[in-house]
């Protein structure tokens, strides 16, 4: 989403921050290490699996994937599904594909599982991958079993439901949520196709025990892979504002009816709070007694800013643009 020429000219003259303060952020606290159990369950189910579908958010195609997936599940045929393509700026999609191919990922597809975009291509791709593999200990089995993996809240359950709509004309088989942690355990097999006979195993989202950088952690948080309060809604809103301005994505100005683009998160959230009526009464002690004043509810405004971004109402965004252009994520952890 772009500004009018006049507003864009004003925005271009603004002095955007060149970097975001990352020192002292406690990333370990954002990503609690209770997910190892889920990974162990996946490993124990591998002997039943013919292929692995890894689902990830298309807004962060080059960062935030769990490296343990490749290490522990890497012997099986693998398809990377970059979901939520409708929310991602895919202007440089070809470069993204080339970058991933350089990492050894040749089987990649972009999808929008809510609207079933490109989902019909998945089963033929998986069938071809399985056909080229040895299917250790499973040659006598006529049905295909696929494990769906990924970090939390990238659309694994949405993918399963979309495949069922496309190939079985059936409704939901697995619950979908807008926050991480909806799928709690490795579930029983869910049928998604008759010909070929194919079942999927839904799995809980599993984050890496160690995130590569603070900035990668913030990107994952913006995409909803952790509960917002663990990172802090206002911190996330500030990083979102910094990112939108840096990449000249000024849809927030139009959406909230702001006079111009702004790099001060307090001012932006104040305007959002006033526009949406998100204010609160606060008692202030003065020399003449208590006085009630109306203040903006900054946390509520930050939550709205984040949710509006996640619904795509601020325009499509590519959070990995810097990585794509050869700049490593900031504050890489030792």
Swiss-Prot record:
NCBIfam families: GTPase_YlqF (TIGR03596). Transmembrane segments: none annotated. It is a peripheral membrane protein. Associates with the mitochondrial ribosome large subunit; the association occurs in a GTP-dependent manner. It comes from Homo sapiens (Human). Residues 36-209 form the CP-type G domain. Its main location: mitochondrion. The gene is MTG1. It comes from the Eukaryota. GO terms for cellular component: mitochondrial inner membrane; mitochondrial matrix; mitochondrial ribosome; mitochondrion; nucleoplasm. Plays a role in the regulation of the mitochondrial ribosome assembly and of translational activity. Displays mitochondrial GTPase activity. The keyword Membrane applies. The keyword Ubl conjugation does not apply. One of its GO terms (biological process) is regulation of respiratory system process. Belongs to the TRAFAC class YlqF/YawG GTPase family. MTG1 subfamily. This is Mitochondrial ribosome-associated GTPase 1. PANTHER family: MITOCHONDRIAL RIBOSOME-ASSOCIATED GTPASE 1 (PTHR45782:SF4). GO terms for molecular function: GTP binding; GTPase activity. Keywords: GTP-binding, Membrane, Mitochondrion, Mitochondrion inner membrane, Nucleotide-binding, Transit peptide, Translation regulation.
């Amino acid at each position: 989403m772009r500004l009018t020429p006049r507003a864009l000219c004003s925005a271009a003259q603004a002095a955007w921050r060149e970097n975001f303060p990352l020192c002292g952020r406690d990333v370990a606290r954002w990503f609690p290490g209770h997910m190892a159990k889920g990974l162990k369950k996946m490993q124990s189910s591998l002997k039943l699996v013919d292929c692995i579908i890894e689902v990830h958010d298309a807004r962060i195609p080059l960062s935030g994937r769990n490296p343990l997936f490749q290490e522990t599940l890497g012997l099986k045929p693998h398809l990377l599904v970059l979901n939520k393509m409708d929310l991602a700026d895919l202007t440089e999609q070809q470069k993204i594909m080339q970058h991933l191919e350089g990492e050894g990922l040749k089987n990649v597809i972009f999808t929008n599982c809510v609207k079933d975009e490109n989902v019909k291509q998945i089963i033929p791709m998986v069938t071809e991958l399985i056909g080229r593999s040895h299917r250790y200990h499973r040659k006598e089995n006529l049905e295909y079993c696929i494990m769906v993996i990924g970090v939390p809240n990238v659309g694994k359950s949405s993918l399963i439901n979309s495949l069922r709509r496309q190939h079985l004309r059936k409704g939901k088989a697995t619950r979908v949520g807008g926050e991480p942690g909806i799928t709690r355990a490795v579930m029983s097999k869910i049928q998604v196709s008759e010909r070929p006979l194919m079942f999927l195993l839904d799995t809980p989202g599993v984050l890496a025990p160690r995130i590569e950088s603070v900035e990668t952690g913030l990107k994952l948080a913006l995409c909803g892979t952790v509960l917002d309060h663990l990172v802090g809604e206002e911190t996330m809103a500030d990083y979102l504002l910094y990112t939108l301005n840096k990449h000249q994505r000024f849809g927030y100005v139009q959406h909230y009816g702001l006079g111009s683009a702004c790099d001060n998160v307090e001012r932006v959230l104040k305007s959002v709070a006033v526009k949406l009526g998100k204010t609160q009464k606060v008692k202030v002690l003065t020399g003449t007694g208590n006085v009630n004043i109306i203040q903006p509810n900054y946390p509520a405004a930050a939550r709205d800013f984040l949710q509006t971004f996640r619904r795509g109402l601020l325009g499509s965004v590519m959070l990995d643009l810097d990585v794509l252009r050869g700049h490593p994520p900031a504050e890489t952890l030792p």
